Amino acid sequence: MKKKEQSLDIISLPIELDRTKIESRYRLALIAAQRAAELSLGATAKIDKKGKKVTTTALLEILSNKIDYITGEEAVKAKEKIDQIDVKKLLEDKRKAIPDLSELEKDLKVYLHGKESAEKMLEDLFTEGESNSSNEQE
């Protein structure tokens, strides 16, 4: 028996690449990989799914111009801008906004603790009264 040669392409569909938008298959593969990752994490597809795999859907979305992407100098500038964003500072700013919520949580805990203490005192009072009356009856 002869083995059939298997194609190791990303998909088995023929791809017509517009060289004015995407200059190489390598660039197409990078963009498709990023989009496939988004799709696998639950992003909604922008076209009707013709394939079963997220890579096929991603490629079809890109080739049908349903996905916005940047390349070249514009991509370099965007990457530099992202690198300048201080993630730690953003997280600290979010944490500063959280103490307001934690103050409310503290107040709620104090209220609930006070309520539980009052209920326990009433319970102890009535159980103590019952035990005293049962001792007197004996």
UniProtKB/Swiss-Prot annotation:
Record carries keyword Transcription = yes
List GO molecular-function terms, semicolon-separated.
Answer: DNA binding; DNA-directed RNA polymerase activity
Please give the name of this protein: DNA-directed RNA polymerase subunit omega
What keywords were assigned to this record? DNA-directed RNA polymerase, Nucleotidyltransferase, Transcription, Transferase
Q: What are the BP-aspect GO terms?
A: DNA-templated transcription
Subunit structure of this chain's protein: The RNAP catalytic core consists of 2 alpha, 1 beta, 1 beta' and 1 omega subunit. When a sigma factor is associated with the core the holoenzyme is formed, which can initiate transcription.
Which family would the database say this protein is a member of? Answer: Belongs to the RNA polymerase subunit omega family.
> Which Gene Ontology CC terms are recorded?
DNA-directed RNA polymerase complex
Q: What class of enzyme is it?
A: transferase
* Functional note: Promotes RNA polymerase assembly. Latches the N- and C-terminal regions of the beta' subunit thereby facilitating its interaction with the beta and alpha subunits.
State the gene name recorded for this protein: rpoZ
Query: What Enzyme Commission number(s) appear in the record?
Result: 2.7.7.6
On the tree of life, the source organism's domain of life is Bacteria
Origin organism is Thermodesulfovibrio yellowstonii (strain ATCC 51303 / DSM 11347 / YP87)
Q: Which reaction does it catalyse?
A: RNA(n) + a ribonucleoside 5'-triphosphate = RNA(n+1) + diphosphate
